[in-house]
Curated annotation (Swiss-Prot):
Transmembrane segment boundaries: 31-51
SUPFAM superfamilies, alphabetized: LDL receptor-like module (SSF57424), SRCR-like (SSF56487), Trypsin-like serine proteases (SSF50494)
Membrane-side (Extracellular) residue stretches: 52-435
Entries under CDD domains matching the protein: LDLa, Tryp_SPc
GO biological processes: negative regulation of growth rate; positive regulation of viral entry into host cell; protein processing; proteolysis; regulation of gene expression; response to wounding
SMART domains, A to Z: SR, Tryp_SPc
Domain of life: Eukaryota
Pfam families per UniProt: SRCR_2, Trypsin
Presence of the UniProt keyword Membrane in the record: yes
Protein name as it appears in the record: Transmembrane protease serine 4
Amino acid sequence: MESDSGQPLNNRDIVPFRKPRRPQETFKKVGIPIIAVLLSLIALVIVALLIKVILDKYYFICGSPLTFIQRGQLCDGHLDCASGEDEEHCVKDFPEKPGVAVRLSKDRSTLQVLDAATGTWASVCFDNFTEALAKTACRQMGYDSQPAFRAVEIRPDQNLPVAQVTGNSQELQVQNGSRSCLSGSLVSLRCLDCGKSLKTPRVVGGVEAPVDSWPWQVSIQYNKQHVCGGSILDPHWILTAAHCFRKYLDVSSWKVRAGSNILGNSPSLPVAKIFIAEPNPLYPKEKDIALVKLQMPLTFSGSVRPICLPFSDEVLVPATPVWVIGWGFTEENGGKMSDMLLQASVQVIDSTRCNAEDAYEGEVTAEMLCAGTPQGGKDTCQGDSGGPLMYHSDKWQVVGIVSWGHGCGGPSTPGVYTKVTAYLNWIYNVRKSEM
């Protein structure tokens, strides 16, 4: 049989008719296996994550050799991992060291240097003072920032000798045989732009505080739970109380939240290191100070800014107005922790009154401050620990750290604070050790 074209038909030329596959059949044959594989992979990932969460919660993994130890063995002072990594990322005691040989005075932030030859302090003359010397002075105090300095006139009541200085990248030194200060001026030095807030507080009495009034306040949290307050000193460092960390020594479980007056309403920042002052066995309530180093530096903004450290000669007389802030309990017994940052205006209480028989009976030492109100009612409670006691001159300074007290807001037992001026050298040395 031939085709119309005259060519014989060949069975091989005939294309068999195939019934098109319906979409439903294609899905059953191809889609379902793919989905099954994806779901299996997702299930495996979820199971792996759950296993990791459980392991991380109860166990620590030692690297070499691979072993598991219980979380309770972390930071217990014993090397349970062969290579000792279970004791590496722990809260560290930082001992007292020799004092830093530079300081700033409340007299116009003038720079003073310790004369190693005589053991006395001298104000620094502006003659031949350079930006390099300014950076060296600031680095001695633990500041790694661009300093600002200017000349200020020597006043007639200047009570320290005036000296020219020299130095290297490590420290300033009094220049031997330096001439008189020809410029008639001292060095006024600022190592960091600090202590500025966008709003001035106007209300008192434990009321809600806007975040831009206190942009240096942070929440320090352990396993996502607020434990203590703290104060931003610079992009890397947070100042707080040592007792916040006595029970929880694993640094990796601590986080810092900054930039919000609502508890838990800002991203958490990982912590690199925590240093606490070595405790004094004779006075266990002393040395309640700690520094937290962040893994990444803060970016300053209207709601994230540093507070100033006090000047070395800053003295607060009784009745000086100061401020306290925090997310503490609103009542002494049975109250709940505030979700909003609270502020209160208080005043410095005379240490003699604070140590009276109806108060703290001599427990308050020279390294502490008392603050409250004579009638009581405005104070700090649990949860405010580590937060700042603040004083305003031309800028805000953190003069105290919330430390301890009996009750909350009692008229005879005001709050007790770590006196920051007593620990300036400790702060300088800790920061300098990490530069």
